[in-house]
């Protein structure tokens, strides 16, 4: 029987497509997963002493070296990281957060609800569109706070008459009032902002330099690794999270740990990371390379003799995963107009294609095959699916 969870071609151009599993893993990470899955491992065993060890020690050491932090901890996703941080640092006390940062994420889940599940009392500060340093200081004076919480509004942008408090300013307030500053970066850029063809996503190291006591982010977004929630920051605070009962409930599994360690090791050489981590490579591929792939795909479709008209067009594509929502990256796509049926019918047939479904999008009456997220080795299967899908 065919597996329900299966390989599909992502022809949408969205590199971090949440519904399609976000970041594909690097070959090194896939090899590490295979090795861990098919064998016993030293997951919680210290080979040097024969004693029990920490399952997350290896990735924590790598994270501290790569990000320049005192300590690190890893759980199963970023929502879990936020939950654990607030449960360990602010249960029964207040956590101040700007009203403009109380976002709703995918599937209808709201940040406020996650914060409240930790046992912290959410103290909203400021107005929806404008929050000032005075708002946080007033909250610190008038409430029994333990945490100043800052959420990066990674899935939307507010423009116009707006004002926000920077992480650096917030951290200074935290020091003044003896409060922990927790920053949820969402995607979390592991490289400096200049390494990406878009702006607006804060780098992890920058957040730590700006004074955040705790920084958390996802493993399967800009990092390009497996699903994971990564916590970095002050050793004393990380230690409290590590010993919290929720840490057991939220712990990361061995296969994700294997993939995460392999991914982090690639970042020891940023150039290698850019070449070998698929999500990073797709986001940074030059438009001329994408055009060449579109030419190749278009030629294959023509050679198949598909009953359709095709054209290579320039397109704009989002990053995905709630990252850089205002950024649209340059790319190229093959636009397909079937000759004998509706384009919606072709789109549905591609989704049902066997053995390899193709997920594309429709724009201005044509089906677009965006080459930013189609691998070269997938192009023949895409061309064959287009031919089969255009048959009346």
Predicted regions and their residues:
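Structural motif of enzymes handling amino- and sulfur-group chemistry
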Residues: 236, 244-245, 252-301, 305, ...
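A short linear hydrophobic-aromatic micro-motif
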Residues: 4-5, 217, 356-361
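Long, charged amphipathic helices and adjacent flexible linkers at domain junctions
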Residues: 47-57, 314-323
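Short Gly/Ser/Thr- and Asp/Glu-enriched loop/turn motifs at secondary-structure junctions
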Residues: 9-13, 223-226, 329, 361-367
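Glycine-rich, N-terminal phosphate-binding loop and its surrounding beta-alpha-beta segment
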Residues: 1-19
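Conserved PLP-enzyme active-site core in the AAT-like
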Residues: 50-267, 302, 385
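Conserved C-terminal alpha-helix-loop-beta "cap" of PLP-dependent enzymes
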Residues: 287, 291-375
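Glycine-rich phosphate-binding segment of PLP-dependent enzymes
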Residues: 11-12, 23-48
